[in-house]
């Protein structure tokens, strides 16, 4: 046991070294006597815990590291250990690590800037499905600076559509994109029957092909819910067309079918915050805040697997007089959250400043007994809020954009 603890401490010190060391000295560190004595397997255990940005500085130090960082097995091993960040895009891209208080900022890709505003994004494995207000669609890895434009069957922008990204099975060899019209905008179509038949578009990145089919849906995704990609499938908060029940709706990319999962553990109210996120990689989490009392409840599910019933468990509740109101006004962006390794809520939200003319974008770390920290990311004028969500939970990763040649759409 003492030997095991010694190895753990050594790995931790090496991670710290590779995270902080500057590029001109990386090759010297790799060739040092101490490093040369380490088994390559131990090096791999160290490197899969190093932040993505630091790994990219290591990438060109030698061919062996380049081969390792391009190895699919290592890429997903590293991804499984990456901590959640929050990404925001406006004129600039901001990637925030709230736990350590770090924020990196850089410009959007040049070709993004001529496509108009990003209407929405859906993260999956560090890849971002980007939907532009002009109708263009792209898959983007900000860390690797890779973009792939998606040729659209119908390039016209459809703000009433829902989007998703996932993959077929556990191999992750076949990422797919989903698009369908949300029934909340087509109530006249199901007024009599309770169901509607939208076109469902699926694009497979591997084969570079679209397919379209129609399916009868007796539910619709609630407004403000942009969807969550988890373990290859998509999840939304949805409502039955003819029943008051609110539930979790999923889309299975392997079977290419919609599957209802379970009811929400809270009463749904459009004036309250009800936000979906991931928990520990393969569980769902739900943040609920009552606008009337400001009380926050955090719920999590058991492991999400096909064919297994989903059970909700309350992780904790927070009732404090100094709790922030995560959505004080309807015209503010919707908050986004995740749960860190210490079971604290990390939430990004907008708050109106005392002058009533400006808005601060704040990140809170909230535990069961305290508000751990508050950091202001930026400010902007109060008014029409774009995008409609405060940010996105993001995992900086080495996952390459499939067939990542930059093929600009016509």
From Swiss-Prot:
Domain F-box: start-end pairs: 32-79
Disulphide bonds in the chain: none
Pfam families to which the protein is assigned, alphabetical: F-box, FBA_1
Superkingdom of source: Eukaryota
WD repeat windows: 109-150, 269-309
SUPFAM superfamilies (alphabetical): F-box domain (SSF81383), Galactose oxidase, central domain (SSF50965)
Gene3D superfamilies reported for this sequence: 1.20.1280.50
Keywords: Repeat, WD repeat
Name the UniProt record assigns to this protein: F-box/WD-40 repeat-containing protein 1
Species annotation: Arabidopsis thaliana
Organismal lineage: Eukaryota, Viridiplantae, Streptophyta, Embryophyta, Tracheophyta
């Amino acid at each position: 046991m003492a030997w095991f603890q010694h190895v753990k401490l050594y790995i931790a010190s090496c991670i710290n070294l590779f995270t902080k060391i500057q590029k001109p000295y990386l090759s010297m560190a790799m060739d040092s006597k101490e490093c040369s004595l380490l088994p390559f397997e131990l090096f791999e255990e160290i490197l899969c815990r190093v932040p993505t940005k630091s790994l990219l500085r290591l990438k060109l130090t030698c061919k062996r590291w380049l081969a390792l960082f391009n190895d699919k097995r290592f890429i997903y091993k590293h991804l499984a250990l990456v901590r959640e960040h929050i990404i925001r895009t406006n004129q600039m891209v901001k990637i925030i690590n709230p736990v350590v208080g770090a924020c990196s900022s850089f410009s959007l890709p040049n070709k993004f800037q001529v496509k108009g505003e990003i209407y929405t994004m859906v993260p999956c494995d560090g890849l971002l499905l980007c939907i532009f207000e002009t109708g263009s669609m792209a898959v983007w890895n900000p860390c690797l600076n890779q973009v792939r434009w998606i040729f659209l069957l119908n390039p016209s922008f459809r703000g009433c559509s829902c989007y998703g990204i996932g993959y077929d099975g556990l191999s992750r060899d076949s990422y797919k994109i989903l698009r369908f019209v949300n029934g909340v905008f087509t109530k006249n179509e199901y007024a009599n029957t309770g169901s509607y038949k939208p076109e469902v578009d699926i694009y497979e990145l591997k084969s570079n092909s679209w397919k379209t089919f129609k399916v009868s849906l007796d539910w619709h995704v609630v407004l403000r819910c942009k969807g969550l990609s988890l373990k290859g499938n998509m999840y939304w908060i949805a409502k039955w067309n003819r029943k008051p029940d609110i539930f979790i709706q999923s889309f299975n990319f392997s079977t290419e079918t919609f599957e209802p999962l379970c009811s929400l553990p809270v009463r749904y109210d459009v004036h309250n915050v009800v936000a979906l996120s991931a928990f520990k990689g393969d569980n769902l989490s739900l943040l609920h805040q009552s606008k009337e009392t400001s009380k926050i409840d955090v719920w999590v599910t058991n492991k999400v697997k096909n064919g297994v019933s989903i059970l909700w468990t309350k992780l904790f509740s927070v009732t404090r007089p100094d709790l922030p109101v995560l959505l004080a006004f309807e015209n503010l962006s919707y908050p986004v959250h995740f749960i860190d390794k210490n079971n604290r809520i990390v939430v990004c939200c907008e708050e109106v400043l005392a002058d009533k003319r400006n808005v601060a974008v704040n990140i809170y770390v909230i535990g069961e007994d305290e508000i751990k920290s508050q950091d202001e990311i930026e400010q902007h004028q109060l008014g029409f809020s774009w995008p409609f969500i405060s940010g996105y939970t993001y995992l900086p990763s080495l996952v390459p954009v499939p067939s990542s040649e930059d093929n600009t759409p016509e």
